[in-house]
C-alpha cells in the first residue's frame, strides 16, 4: 500500500473480522496512475451512517490489515477505458497482468476467493470449487469472501461474535431474487445477532430506471421516485437492501455515504462510464473474513 492512500476504518464488526472496500488508488491499470494525495486529503473526512452507526476515523499510513472496513481513495481517469487505478475485475477487458498485480496488493489477498458473478441469487460456502455465484459465506479464517461492484450494492455481514461472515453482490436482479435472504440461511446465528454493512453503490439520486423496473420495487418505502423525464424513475438500491436486511431481522445495519456515480473519482461506476462514453470500466472489491 502506498503512502498516498487513506483509509476509513469501519468499526461495526468484531475485532477478529477483517472487512474492507477498495477504491481506485494505488493500482497499475493503464500504467499511468499519478499521486493524488492532495485530492485524497480533501475527499476523506469521515462518513455518515444509519442505525447503530459508528463514526469513521480517517487515518494515514495505517496497515489495511489492522482493523475492519476501509475505503481506499483514488483519482479520476481520462481516456477511452475507465480502468485507471486499482481495478480488480478480470472480466472487463483490462490487462490481465495488471489485474493480477492489483489483486495481489489487496490486504489478505492470498485468502480471497474470487467469484464469477452473474447477477443471480446463488450463495456458496467457502471453500468450494463452484465459483459461479453472487455471494459467498465463510466460517474459516483461511477463506475470505469477496464481491466486485461498479454501482451494484456490496453487502458485508458478520455475526456479532465474529465466527461467520458473508459478502453479497446485490444489483437490482439480485435484490429482486432475494439473494440477501439466501445468504442469511447459511448463518447459524439468529439474524438479530448479525451485523451488516452496505458499501459504496450508486445512490437513489443517480440511478434512473424505466417504469417496468421501478414497478418491481414499488412496495419499498421511499425507494422509488418519479424523475423529471416522463416515464423515468429514480431507484434507491442501497436503501432497498437496507429494508430487506431489516425485514429479515438484522437490527444493526450501517450504510456507506458514498455514491459510486457521484464519486467516480474514488470508485468505478459502470453507469458513469457509459454516460462518459467509456468503452468499459473497472471494478472495486468488498472483502470480509476472519482473522
PLM features per residue range, with description:
Residues 1-50, 59-291:
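Active-site microenvironment for binding and transforming phosphate-containing groups
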Amino acid at each position: 500500500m502506498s503512502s498516498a492512500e487513506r483509509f476509513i476504518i469501519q468499526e461495526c464488526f468484531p475485532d477478529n473480522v477483517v472487512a474492507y472496500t477498495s477504491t481506485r488508488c494505488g493500482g497499475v491499470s493503464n500504467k499511468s496512475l499519478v499521486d493524488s494525495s492532495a485530492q485524497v486529503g480533501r475527499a476523506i473526512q469521515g462518513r455518515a451512517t444509519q442505525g447503530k452507526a459508528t463514526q469513521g476515523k480517517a487515518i494515514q499510513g495505517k496497515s489495511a490489515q489492522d482493523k475492519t472496513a476501509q475505503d481506499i481513495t483514488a483519482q479520476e481517469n481520462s481516456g477511452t477505458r475507465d480502468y485507471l487505478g486499482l481495478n480488480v475485475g478480470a472480466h472487463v477487458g483490462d490487462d490481465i497482468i495488471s489485474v493480477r498485480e492489483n489483486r495481489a496488493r489487496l490486504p489478505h489477498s492470498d485468502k480471497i476467493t474470487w467469484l464469477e458473478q452473474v447477477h443471480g441469487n446463488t450463495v456458496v460456502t467457502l471453500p468450494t470449487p463452484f465459483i459461479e455465484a453472487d455471494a459467498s459465506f465463510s466460517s474459516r479464517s483461511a477463506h475470505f469472501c469477496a464481491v466486485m461492484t461498479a454501482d451494484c450494492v456490496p453487502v458485508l455481514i458478520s455475526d456479532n461474535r465474529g465466527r461467520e461472515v458473508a459478502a453479497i453482490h446485490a444489483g437490482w436482479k439480485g435484490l429482486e431474487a432475494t439473494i440477501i435472504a439466501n445468504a442469511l440461511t447459511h448463518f447459524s446465528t439468529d439474524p438479530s445477532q448479525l451485523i451488516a454493512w452496505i458499501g459504496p453503490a450508486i445512490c437513489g439520486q443517480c440511478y434512473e430506471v424505466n417504469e417496468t423496473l421501478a414497478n418491481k420495487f414499488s412496495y419499498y418505502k421511499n425507494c422509488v421516485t418519479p424523475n423529471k423525464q416522463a416515464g423515468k424513475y429514480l431507484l434507491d438500491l442501497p436503501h432497498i437492501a437496507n429494508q430487506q436486511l431489516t425485514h429479515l431481522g438484522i437490527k444493526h445495519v450501517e450504510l456507506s455515504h458514498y455514491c459510486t456515480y457521484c464519486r467516480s473519482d474514488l470508485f468505478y461506476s459502470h453507469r458513469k462510464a457509459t454516460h462518459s462514453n467509456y468503452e468499459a470500466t473497472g471494478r472495486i472489491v468488498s472483502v470480509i473474513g476472519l482473522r
